């Protein structure tokens, strides 16, 4: 008999609900997701692990507790910075339970740094990364052509920026050909559109220099020009790129990776096209340099000829040397006159072209004249270089002939000229007798001797 029967009472067994592990975890997960569907959590990143799938896994911790965080690829790719251990952040998402391990976690949809903004952190991170790869190195910078005939500009086709660039280019050199690649300079598609412009000019447009331009703005406004893809497009460009983004105080990743940074779009136009005065000054400087180099070379040959002419071993060769020296002087004079005429003609053609620009606004006609003038300038420069080379070769050949005729060159090989006491050149041992005094002329110095026995 049971205890309850002895007392005369009947006890019913308590009702028990027995859960399967899967069911209880699922129920708790659902309750958590209902109650904590949209929460903000701050903490320090630890155990950061990006997966090959693009998902991000890490923990947020404070002084005593950790919370697992997962951010799926669709949200992770929208981040403007790269999460890393030790970075304090604020995460937004829903609390859930990872059923496989019964582990509490936050499924993050948004992440931002505490303190400094995400864009600034992304800027510093990308700057450090590209600098470590050497993309900012000075030796990578390509020179900007002095007088480009064709310029590519990547910017918005509307607004003050493109007008400022065109106005400066027209004022400094109206014949330059400008191609504009229209691109958004702000917004989600801006970076890819600007990068497409850089690639287009490298493949199809045959331009000599590219200007990437945008007006000033906040770091958010200039975010497209801090894009890694755009930076690498500029770095791999075979055509020199000038970055003209923002105001003078604004710096972007494009500024660091470009071949030249201009403080403003207008300044970029001034840097890429020299004024007529600058061209004249450059031509004058080149003319002076060529003339100075020619004078130095001619002076060297004149000194060498004078030294050879004064040497006692030459004797009757002074007349031949004088004739050759006169020929050298004549060549030098004719070369100087030709050089002066070439540069005078070049300056005159540039003056005529400049006058036509000031009095006519026939852009197509002037462009043709500019192309013709440029071709003639190149032809004149090539002719001048060829003339200089031809004259220099001829002078060197004359000097070589003189050197070959010089007895000094023979003496320097170990031979000697022997003279008797009267200074007559001895060619036969029978010209002297025992006891006669003779003098041997060497390459450096003389030796006197007494004949012991002629043979």
Curated annotation (Swiss-Prot):
UniProt keyword annotation of Amino-acid biosynthesis present: no
Reaction it catalyzes: Exonucleolytic cleavage in either 5'- to 3'- or 3'- to 5'-direction to yield nucleoside 5'-phosphates
Keyword Cytoplasm attributed: yes
Record keywords: Cytoplasm, Exonuclease, Hydrolase, Nuclease
GO annotation, biological process: DNA catabolic process
Domain of life: Bacteria
A GO molecular-function annotation: nucleic acid binding
Coiled-coil annotated residue ranges, if any: none
EC number: 3.1.11.6
Cellular component annotations (GO), alphabetically ordered: cytoplasm; exodeoxyribonuclease VII complex
Subcellular location: Cytoplasm
Family per record: Belongs to the XseA family.
NCBIfam families registered for this protein in UniProt: xseA
Quaternary structure, from the entry: Heterooligomer composed of large and small subunits.
Function field: Bidirectionally degrades single-stranded DNA into large acid-insoluble oligonucleotides, which are then degraded further into small acid-soluble oligonucleotides.
Name recorded for this polypeptide: Exodeoxyribonuclease 7 large subunit
Lineage, highest ranks first: Bacteria, Pseudomonadati, Acidobacteriota, Terriglobia, Terriglobales
